[in-house]
Regions:
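Conserved class I S-adenosyl-L-methionine
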Residues: 56-83
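A short SAM/SAH-binding and catalytic strip from SAM-dependent methyltransferases
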Residues: 26-41, 61-63
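Short, conserved SAM-binding/catalytic segment
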Residues: 1-8
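A short glycine-rich, Lys/Arg-flanked "PGG" loop and its adjoining helix->strand segment in the class I
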Residues: 41-56
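Short conserved AdoMet
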Residues: 5, 38, 52, 102, ...
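A short acidic, Gly/Pro-enriched loop at the edge of an enzyme's catalytic core
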Residues: 16-28
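Conserved residues in the N-terminal Rossmann fold of short-chain dehydrogenase/reductase
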Residues: 12
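Conserved Class I S-adenosyl-L-methionine
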Residues: 88-174
Length: 174
């Protein structure tokens, strides 16, 4: 509230069941969440329903190359590791987002965010990897020291690890 002032409000809710009347909102924002919806079409239908005719829907998502270097590093260490049980970008990503949004919105603009990270802290990277939603704990849990040494070696040899951030913003109008 301190940053936004009194002219703005936000609500956290289930996009698949929005408890507001038709044409209620000027703007709806979904920041890296659409790929988690059980029923994406229902969520998009609800979002479109509650937007005013001149309303704007902003949604962000990842692309298929997002943090690909982390996946490569982990697979090179142990090919059995999957950092995610679901391929989120197949559900809703930069590559298929416009197609998925087009039944609900007339104008769709994609703005890609060209960025990367340079990681030079093996322990921080290891902690991030261990926080992912895959099977890495099963295969790395008893090998953490070995895995950290593997990361430290890569960081030392390359003066850090450059990690691709493949993200973007869809701006949609009804």
């Amino acid at each position: 509230r301190k940053k936004l002032g009194n002219d703005y409000n936000y609500i956290v809710l289930d996009a698949q069941n929005i408890p507001f009347k038709n044409h209620f909102f000027d703007t709806v924002i979904a920041n890296h969440v659409l790929f988690y919806l059980q029923d994406l079409n229902l969520g998009l239908l609800e979002i479109s329903r509650v937007l005013k005719d001149y309303g704007i829907f902003y949604c962000t998502t990842y692309g298929k190359n997002h943090m690909k270097e982390i996946t490569e590093i982990v697979h090179n260490f142990d090919s059995r590791i999957q950092l995610s049980n679901n391929n989120l970008v197949e559900h809703f990503g930069l590559e298929n987002g416009e197609t998925l949004l087009s039944p609900y919105f007339k104008q769709i603009e994609l703005k890609r965010y060209d960025d990367y990270l340079i990681v030079d802290d093996a322990k921080a990277l290891m902690n991030y990897i261990m926080s992912c939603h895959g099977n890495q704990k099963e295969y790395l849990g008893y090998r953490l020291k070995e895995f950290q040494a593997h990361l430290e070696k890569i960081i030392d040899e390359n003066n850090g690890i450059k990690i691709t951030k493949d993200c973007g913003l869809f701006i949609c109008r009804k």
